[in-house]
Amino acid sequence: MERTIDPGTLPYRPCVGIVLINREGLIFAGQRIDSPVPAWQMPQGGIDEGEKPREAALRELWEETGIPAERVEFVAKAPDWVTYDLPPELLGRVWGGKYRGQRQKWFLYRYLGTDDEVGIGTDHAEFSCWRWIGAEEMVAAIVPFKRAVYEEVVATFRPHLA
């Protein structure tokens, strides 16, 4: 018998998200390596114990794209945390079943390097390929349960995006 999980009893996982833009204002989008269907997203991940959100953002950027902090310029930070809930079919199956979704702080960075410096084949590889895309295409490409988050993030950083 499968046990039913009440999402209201679970906390949100503290995370960061990174909107990485190039000189034209296009957004870095990575194709998730663990998805059987096209699932594009921006770099994101958990905040480690004792880590500040901005530190976590730069660490996640490095782990997922191979881009070091010296090759990006801080542009902005979203004023509010945003949350999303996992859909029922994923609840209890990811993150050891400990979380109902994520609570994210988003950061906007401008990439100062060249495309050939991006290295997604890192020790913590999350993406099978990547590309630069416009804001509307990024929102359309994300999995549906994260779409409201991406809409809010894009609206927040709109003045800087292509």
UniProtKB/Swiss-Prot annotation:
InterPro entries: Nudix_hydrolase, NUDIX_hydrolase-like_dom_sf, NUDIX_hydrolase_CS, NUDIX_hydrolase_dom, RppH. GO terms for molecular function: bis(5'-adenosyl)-pentaphosphatase activity; guanosine-3',5'-bis(diphosphate) 3'-diphosphatase activity. Keywords: Hydrolase. PROSITE patterns: NUDIX (PS51462), NUDIX_BOX (PS00893). A motif (Nudix box) lies at residues 45-66. Residues 11-155 form the Nudix hydrolase domain. Its cofactor is a divalent metal cation. Its EC number is 3.6.1.-. GO terms for biological process: nucleoside phosphate metabolic process; ribose phosphate metabolic process. Disulfide bonds: none annotated. Belongs to the Nudix hydrolase family. RppH subfamily. Accelerates the degradation of transcripts by removing pyrophosphate from the 5'-end of triphosphorylated RNA, leading to a more labile monophosphorylated state that can stimulate subsequent ribonuclease cleavage. This is RNA pyrophosphohydrolase. The gene is rppH.
